[in-house]
Design a protein with these regions (language model features):
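Class II aminoacyl-tRNA synthetase catalytic cores and aaRS-like
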Residues: 2-594
Length: 594
């Protein structure tokens, strides 16, 4: 049996023909491997083989890893730093070894908080972190501050306390260390004469990852802070605190719902139709469905309500959504949304639950500022008290603000009537809203004349016209006679925080509302590619799901990014996203190509 046949017998898959996808993956994997140091050395050795004439013709490269280092030093303008590390044989990136008493810096500070100047600890521990400052006191004593897990500790390295053969070894180990380097050091806890908890090194520090690019003391330029977010996080504590607050808020939301017996679920991001909100979707395609246009979800609402139909009476989801719309201080095309649906809940219960949630989050944020997130700026947020949560009804409040009596907003020509009334009062909407649907026009009027009242206290705007909430139950308002929805929006400090309503569970009424929505979009010329209000069609699949019976259900949605903005006191949505807005992310890619 030949060796090849033997291999086939043992490993038949080696000789199986590859598909196109597998071939492409193999090429990618081969290319990725080729940049490793081991592969470079192997290829270099082959290039020297006398029988490899094809490779022999290639320019001779002694070590491609060195070439990569040379390219880095040129592009980063830090050749001197790299040469110094080479000189001290410190340009290394070693693997970490297991240590029985490795501690995080926060745990070290907590464990040894009672150590005194006269009674240092005897237990040896290993700390790892990034050098934020380093200073020498003569040639026998060096101090450094290392940070990790958002806390710092001082390390004292004395020639008299570490095992070295001679002072030159002490110098050669410490001399190449700079701010930004990542090190590990073993020692015992002590407190200095000034009362500072420190680690007294019993071994010389080991360099785990040198910082070959200079680490600034501070970043101020906003564009640079976003484009170099990793540096911003290292030098600006407030940036990290905002992102950490985001994590705490999401955890608080999850705990809040779990404590109330909600089930967390995940619903599709990609489907053949994006419904659940009035927004233009991102459209794409998939190789499995070459002739079908797909869309990224704009909201998880319709999926979640299908689960309620299926008997999951309390569900919630926290996840991404995508809307192909404008980008400004409070909007980003990619954002995080939280929605919950609770069977047998009405609008008043949803509003009460919202108030409880926001109050709890405010208190939680204050405690975090006092304990873990000291740089948060939440002082300007007016604290809601028991009696200052206001409620206004949409139609009466807007009529008072405009000084007009709104037409019957259910009439087919309501849009034209409203435009004529606004023209008579010299309150025509801006040019960009010409041709907008009645829904968008009413939304603009509310944002201009009603939402500002939330600057001094939280404001619920309730009972929007039915045309503004086609997925909500509707009823005739006894006060105005208008057909309105069982809906409320919460605004705090001028920002929309949450949207909630009693869900339409009548399949026949839901179909009628979908059809009216389609007609409205066609009338305003916004149907085509989705316009500003998204795709318009009757979602037959959802209507059929309702035919199996959706119990009376309350639904609620909140933009997590805006919630973090509110609680952190940040003015821009980019500040609460790990790498800024979509504009920042795209700019980052463009800068990398230059």
């Amino acid at each position: 049996m030949s060796s090849r046949k033997g291999l086939y017998f043992l490993r038949p898959f080696i000789f199986s023909p590859l598909t196109k996808k597998e071939t492409a993956y193999a090429r990618f994997f081969s290319a990725a491997r080729s940049i490793s140091r081991r592969e470079v050395i192997r290829v270099t050795a082959r290039s020297r083989h006398p029988h490899n004439a094809a490779v022999k013709a290639q320019p001779k490269i002694e070590n491609d890893y060195d070439a990569a280092v040379a390219e880095l030093s040129h592009s980063a303008a830090n050749e001197g730093r790299i040469q110094k590390l080479k000189e001290y044989n410190a340009l290394r990136y070693p693997r970490v070894s297991r240590h029985g008493n490795r501690m995080s810096i926060p745990k070290f500070r907590h464990t040894f908080e009672n150590v005194t100047t006269s009674a240092p600890a005897s237990e040896e521990v290993l700390l790892q972190g990034r050098i934020m400052s380093i200073r020498a006191s003569g040639y026998k004593l060096v101090f450094m501050d290392i940070s990790g897990d958002f806390e710092k500790v001082q390390v004292m390295i004395s020639l008299n306390n570490v095992p070295v053969d001679n002072p030159e070894e002490f110098k050669r180990t410490l001399h190449p260390l700079l701010r930004g380097d990542i090190v590990s050091v073993t020692g015992t806890a002590m407190r200095t004469s000034s009362g500072e908890l420190s680690l007294k090194a019993t071994t010389l520090p080991s360099l785990l990852s040198p910082c070959v690019a200079p680490l600034p003391k501070k970043l101020i330029n906003e564009e640079t802070r976003i484009l170099k977010r990793h540096v911003d996080l290292l030098v600006n504590r407030e940036t990290a605190d905002v992102l950490r607050l985001r994590s705490y808020i999401i955890k608080y939301l999850r705990d809040f719902f779990h404590e109330r017996d909600f089930t967390e679920v995940q619903t599709p991001l990609l489907a053949d139709y994006a419904g659940g909100a009035a927004a233009r979707p991102f459209l794409t395609s998939a190789t499995e469905f070459p002739n079908k246009e797909l869309a990224l979800r704009i909201a998880p609402e319709l999926w979640l309500k299908r689960l309620v139909v299926g008997g999951m009476n309390k569900v919630f989801e926290i996840g991404p959504a995508f809307r192909n719309e404008g980008l400004d201080a409070t909007h980003n095309p990619e954002f995080t949304i939280c929605e919950f649906y609770s069977a047998y809940s009405n609008l008043q219960e949803l509003m009460a639950m919202t108030e409880t949630l926001i109050r709890g989050l405010l208190e939680h944020t204050k405690l975090l500022k006092e304990s873990k997130l000291p740089t948060l700026d939440i002082a300007e947020l007016a604290e809601p008290s028991e009696d200052n949560w206001r409620q206004v009804e949409f139609v009466p409040a807007l009529e008072d603000a405009l000084g007009i009596k709104l037409p019957n907003l259910s009439d087919p020509d309501a849009h034209e009537q409203l435009i004529n009334l606004l023209e008579g009062k010299s309150r025509l909407p801006p040019v960009e809203l010409e041709g907008a649907s009645l829904n968008r026009l009413l939304d603009h009027l509310a944002s201009t004349h009603l939402e500002g009242d939330s600057l001094t206290a939280p404001l619920f705007i309730t009972h929007h016209p039915a045309c503004m909430a086609p997925l909500a139950k509707s009823f005739a308002c006894p006060r105005t006679g208008q057909l309105v929805s069982a809906r409320a929006e919460l605004f705090v400090a001028g920002r929309e925080i949450a949207n909630m309503y009693e869900e339409e569970n009548d399949p026949f009424e839901q179909r009628r509302k979908f059809e009216l929505q389609v007609l409205s979009r066609r009338g305003s010329g916004e149907e085509g590619d989705g316009g500003e209000e998204g795709q318009a069609r009757v979602d037959e699949s959802y209507v059929r799901a309702l035919e199996h019976g959706l119990p009376p259900t309350g639904g609620w949605g909140c933009g997590v990014d805006r919630l973090v903005m509110l609680l952190s006191g940040t003015p821009r949505i980019a500040d609460v996203l790990s790498f800024g807005s979509l504009r920042n992310v795209v700019s980052l890619s463009q800068v990398a190509k230059k």
